[in-house]
């Protein structure tokens, strides 16, 4: 598939915005220094001005006024800590055309093909050189359109990023701002002096793979990875949830806990982990509803903490299907205000937050990361030409990282997008649907 860029514009806020440096909290900084990729797809409506660049750029320029940090650049303070320099430098808006059709992307698995729908960012010139938000509208020959989004992770997490994108789409439809962004991250400042009360296993190094005769690598080469997406219907999710009552269990586990636990179990089985192998699950956990007092609606930034149950693979595989969900459930129950405030303090005492940033070394076999977008309004970006037929990650950077996505049609189904070693993917699919 060929994609030809027609025009690239740096879109700036439509009015004067505060010129300031925005302080970042510890949870803004303990994230990978890259642009989180996501892609929306839209079917044609027959409208003559379908995804008109002028309409989109005008609305974008308007949305950047209240969300002015999005138009800024990263910089460092005198201690080397990353801040956002808010001077209205602008966001990159690219318009492109493709000789392909939307259906060429099949089930929209976040493969390398999807990655070309998002502008590539050149990180080689330093952190002040690139836009925090890069956008690409690609028109396909079927009349459909994709919107590719790359959002610098220090600028926003999923909830804040979608608050911005959905405000932009509302403004393109002529609507006004409903919830203003709250631009002050000092609400997540550590206590002075910091008083961590817990050991914070989530920031400790993960278990390493025990070498057995079965998994001894033949060469030093990094194993080939594969990315797939699997859909589970509402009936399948309900069947899975009903399994929480097996073997006399009386605790009520949510559909999410059962699904995430089942993904963890299926991954352990597909990887053929040794019976005594420890495995750590990393669950991205939004602190907005857990902190007390709760953050103002529209708090703009990162409020993602990490829940990390650890279990032995043999237990996950041999115990009832709800066992993995019980490990998640218990770990999530601990994520209250005291724990999250302690995490902010724990991070404050670390000499180098970069050392704690999660990456390939974190999620790889025998461990797993799960990020759920199920409760996020990922399908609300209606720019005046209807809701997207799909929205999901535009790539999965690491083996062992997965996403749970809600249905675009609200039919109760969920999809699991995951990156695993290629030799484990077929087995994962088998175990995922076997319950």
Swiss-Prot record:
It holds the Pfam family Transferase. Highly expressed in stem vascular tissues. It catalyses: shikimate + 4-coumaroyl-CoA = trans-4-coumaroylshikimate + CoA. Keywords: Acyltransferase, Transferase. Its EC number is 2.3.1.133. The keyword Acyltransferase applies. The active site is at 153 (proton acceptor), 382 (proton acceptor). GO terms for molecular function: acyltransferase activity, transferring groups other than amino-acyl groups; shikimate O-hydroxycinnamoyltransferase activity. PANTHER family: SHIKIMATE O-HYDROXYCINNAMOYLTRANSFERASE, TRICHOTHECENE 3-O-ACETYLTRANSFERASE. Acyltransferase involved in the biosynthesis of lignin. The affinity for shikimate as acceptor is 100-fold higher than for quinate. The most efficient donors are caffeoyl-CoA > p-coumaroyl-CoA > feruloyl-CoA >> sinapoyl-CoA. Belongs to the plant acyltransferase family. This is Shikimate O-hydroxycinnamoyltransferase. It comes from Nicotiana tabacum. The lineage of its organism: Eukaryota, Viridiplantae, Streptophyta, Embryophyta, Tracheophyta.
């Amino acid at each position: 598939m060929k994609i030809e860029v027609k025009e690239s514009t740096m879109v700036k806020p439509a009015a004067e915005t505060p010129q300031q440096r925005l302080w970042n909290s510890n949870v803004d900084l303990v994230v990978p220094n890259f642009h989180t990729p996501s892609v929306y797809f839209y079917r044609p409506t027959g409208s003559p001005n379908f995804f008109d660049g002028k309409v989109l750029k005008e609305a974008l320029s308007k949305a950047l006024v209240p969300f002015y940090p999005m138009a800024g650049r990263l910089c460092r303070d005198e201690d080397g800590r990353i801040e956002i320099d808010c001077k209205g430098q602008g966001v990159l808006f690219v318009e492109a055309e493709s000789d392909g059709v939307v259906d060429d992307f099949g089930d929209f698995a976040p493969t390398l093909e999807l990655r070309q729908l998002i502008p590539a960012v050149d990180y080689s010139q330093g952190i002040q050189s690139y836009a925090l938000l890069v956008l690409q509208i690609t028109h396909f020959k079927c009349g459909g359109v994709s919107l590719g989004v790359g959002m610098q992770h220090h600028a926003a997490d999923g909830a804040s990023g979608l608050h911005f994108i959905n405000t932009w789409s509302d403004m393109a439809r002529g609507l006004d701002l409903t919830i203003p962004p709250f631009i002050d991250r000092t609400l997540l400042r550590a206590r002075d002096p910091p008083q961590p009360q817990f050991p914070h296993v989530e920031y400790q190094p993960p278990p390493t793979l025990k070498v057995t005769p079965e998994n001894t690598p033949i060469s030093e080469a990094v194993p080939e990875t594969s990315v797939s997406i699997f859909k589970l219907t509402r009936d399948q999710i309900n069947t899975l949830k009903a399994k929480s009552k097996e073997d006399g269990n009386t605790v009520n586990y949510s559909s999410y806990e059962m699904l995430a636990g089942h993904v963890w179990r299926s991954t352990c089985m597909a990887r053929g982990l040794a019976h005594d192998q420890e495995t750590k699950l990393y669950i991205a956990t939004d602190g907005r509803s857990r902190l007390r007092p709760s953050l103002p609606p529209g708090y703009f930034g990162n409020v993602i903490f990490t829940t990390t149950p650890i279990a032995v693979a043999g237990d996950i595989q041999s115990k009832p299907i709800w066992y993995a969900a019980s490990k998640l459930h218990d770990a999530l129950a601990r994520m209250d205000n005291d724990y999250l405030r302690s995490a902010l303090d724990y991070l404050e005492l670390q000499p180098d937050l970069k050392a704690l940033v999660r990456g390939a070394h974190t999620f790889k076999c025998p461990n797993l990361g799960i990020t759920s977008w199920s409760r996020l309004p990922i399908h609300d970006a209606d720019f005046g030409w209807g809701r997207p037929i799909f929205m999901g990650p535009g790539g999965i950077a690491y083996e062992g990282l997965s996403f749970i996505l809600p249905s675009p049609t609200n039919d109760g189904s969920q999809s699991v997008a995951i990156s695993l070693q290629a030799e484990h993917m077929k087995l994962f699919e088998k175990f995922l649907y076997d319950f």
